Structures are given as C-alpha cells and as structure tokens.
C-alpha cells in the first residue's frame, strides 16, 4: 500500500490581486514539473483528488497541486468558479518562476489544462486528462452524476451527498462514512456552498446553457483541434458523470491524442484504477522530451 506522503500539511500560498492561491509542492526540486489540476463537486480539493497517486509521481517529478478558488482552500475570487479557474494557471506558474509543465487535469481540471495548453503551447510538455472533457454524443445531458450533484447543491443533505458520491465510483464500497464526513464538512461550508451554487445550481446551469446557446463563440469541445501538445485522455469505463462517449470528439479532433479506458472504474479513475493509472500516465509522461 502506498504510503501517504508527508506533504499533507505543507500547504503554501501566493498572493494575487483577487486573493490567495494555495498549493502543495513536493518531489525533487530539480525534477520536471508536473501540475495537478482538480475537478469540481461538493467537498473537492486538489489534495483529495491526487493524494493517493502523489507518492508515485513525486519520485520522479516536482509535483504541484493547485487549489482552485471557490472550493474552500484557496480564497474565493467570486464569479463562476469554473471560469475563474481558467485564469489561475498562468499567474500561479509565473509566481513560482516555472516556465514549463506537464499537466494532469481531473474532469474540470482537464478542461482548464486544455485551455491553458491551447493558449500557451510552449509552456506545456504533455497533457493528461481524466474524464470530464468533450460533449455527450449518445448519453443524455445532464448525466446522472451531474443531476445528483445539482440536487445536492440545491438542498444539501447527507443522503444526497452519499447518492452523488456513489455515482462517482464503480465500486460502491469506496463510499465510506469517513469519505462522506470528509466531504460533508467542506461541502456545507457556507462560502463553498455558495460557490458551488454559482456553478451547479439549477438556475446557474440554465443560465450557462442559455449563454452558450446565444454565443457566437465555439463551444470548448469544438476548439480542441487547436491543442498541439501530446495528450493522453484517460477515462473510467463506468463513468456516470461524464460517460465515455464524451471522449470521442476529443479523441478524433486533438491532433496528437491517445485514449486509455480503465475497466471497472467510474469518474475517479486515478483512485479506482490507481496502479494502472499510475503506470499508464508515467509511461506517457516519460515518452519523448516534450
């Protein structure tokens, strides 16, 4: 069993005009830099998304876990947390004096990573996404996991949180009382809940869909042909938040993309398929000098 790294309480911060960005920094200082970008959802943090795989990656890489604003660790910058997240990567890396990174982005973090890599192709070596990007082709939208997330955000109860957590995983036994309690305490923090409602409340979701329908700008999945860095798309076969049919457009349109689907795994492939995820991603990151 992988030993939990000793960086749990080594939370650092940088100041920005909008508030503090907090992050973890571990692994060899002289190693290539691997930036982890977390997903969204009740009680999420970068640390919780990636603490399990950190010991493996920190052996070879300087690992940075950025905590996005509005999720209870970094300050809340206001606005739509997903939109805010897009603007944090460049100033974060600039403040640390880091020129180039590999990126592992989970769900929303994958979208942030793609956006950053399209805008800054010279700053990204290789990019790994975990579910959550693309668009539904055959599966209904919103997905089961997103609907359960909306229900929790509208009216938070422990049972709704457990129902949502169970939609995140293939192995239902992973949703323990301990996990639910850990998520509940942060998810129901008033400021964090307010930020979640700005993103996943039914009114916010409807407003976002209306804005996208009225916009002349292409939707995120329609600009992925502009992504030039080598990209590994990873997915859980049994993902009920972002079903695997969402991978088809990114797989076809990203020029240098490969797709790896893990069996018996839901939206948290890096947790449910930990060893296979680690070996697959390490092999990809170790290929070439990019």
Per-region residue spans from a language model:
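Conserved HGGG/HGGXW glycine-rich cap/lid loop of the alpha/beta-hydrolase fold
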Residues: 17-73
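Acidic catalytic loop of the alpha/beta-hydrolase fold
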Residues: 238-242
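Flexible "cap/lid" loop of the alpha/beta hydrolase fold
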Residues: 114, 118, 125-163
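Conserved alpha/beta-hydrolase catalytic His-Asp/Glu region
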Residues: 140, 157-223
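Gly/Ala-rich beta-loop-alpha elbow adjacent to hydrolase catalytic centers
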Residues: 105, 109, 113
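Short beta-strand/loop motif that positions the catalytic acidic residue
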Residues: 227, 233-235
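Active-site loop/oxyanion-hole signature of alpha/beta-hydrolase fold enzymes
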Residues: 54-55, 65-104, 279-282
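Catalytic active-site module of serine/aspartate enzymes centered on a nucleophile-bearing elbow/loop
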Residues: 257-290
